[in-house]
Swiss-Prot record:
It is an enzyme of class 2 (transferase). SUPFAM superfamilies: Periplasmic binding protein-like II, Porphobilinogen deaminase (hydroxymethylbilane synthase), C-terminal domain. It comes from the Eukaryota. Its cofactor is dipyrromethane. It holds the Pfam family Porphobil_deamC. This is Porphobilinogen deaminase. The gene is HEM3. One of its GO terms (molecular function) is hydroxymethylbilane synthase activity. GO terms for biological process: heme biosynthetic process; protoporphyrinogen IX biosynthetic process. It comes from Eremothecium gossypii (strain ATCC 10895 / CBS 109.51 / FGSC 9923 / NRRL Y-1056) (Yeast). Signal peptide: none annotated. The porphobilinogen subunits are added to the dipyrromethan group. Binds 1 dipyrromethane group covalently. Belongs to the HMBS family. Tetrapolymerization of the monopyrrole PBG into the hydroxymethylbilane pre-uroporphyrinogen in several discrete steps.
Amino acid sequence: MGEETLRIAGRRSKLAVIQSESVKEIVQREFPNYTCTVLAKQTLGDQVQSKPLYAFGGKALWTKELEDLLYEEDLDQRIDMIVHSLKDMPTQLPEGFELGAITKRVDPSDCLVMAAGSPYKTLGDLPNGSVVGTSSIRRSAQLRRRYPHLVFASVRGNIQTRLKKLDDPENECKCIILATAGLVRLGLESRITQRFDSTIMLHAVGQGALGIETRTGDERLQAILAKVADRNSTICCLAERSLMRTLEGGCSVPIGVYSTFDEETSMLTLDGLVVSVDGADAAEATVSYKIKSDKEDAIACGQLLAAKLLEAGAKKILDAIHLPEA
């Protein structure tokens, strides 16, 4: 078989490039006849750093500029796939685009990062009125519920920028909350002060996994993506995305999840939480679901949990959230 070229694109941040390169390595290992190139492109979410994430409404914030390249008329500029942090991918993709594969998940938890030299080890240790930096209302809403003595402020920028801001003596934040996976992929695991297990915080839908977006029905890529995809992570993440899609929440709505799939018993367990922005109200539920058909049953599991959460009061919470227009 002759040599073929595959064009992989992602965002321009250091973390995004590492993620794109990781997919390139898998493809070239499994398909030595392919030469892969990586394109790094800026998106709207990268360009506008002055607004908190919820102010954008959460739709296509990190994706549109890249999606345009999948159908670029100039074939020399056209790409074949986009590597996203799955948590940043809208659960409803535009017509002509599909989620082609989900990679093996890195630790999906959120974590606490204290400023350099801080004597504090947990959020409970912090004095009253301490400022915690996070750009996610899912994180701040859950933490407000557990730690009412703390104050929360929006912190934007890539991970290195956020860490630099945190360590600046003039900075008001005592700590920041980040996705564990990002620090692990960047080799910055030593900055993690505490990983939050599911008793402290439920993570974002799809967190820790990479989602690969392609043109709908691109048969050439299907055999390639089958080697990139991870079954366990795919089942869990499809269920999580189904939950969010059913609740009609963008990535800025405070929905937390935790999922596990037991490959021996084929049982998928999915926990979900919808919490009000101020942390005062919450709806929680759990479902266990026997997986016989991976995609269909994972989606059904998410829909079932959504129905349980709505019964538990999630609709009232979601209806009360009026996010600013972009």
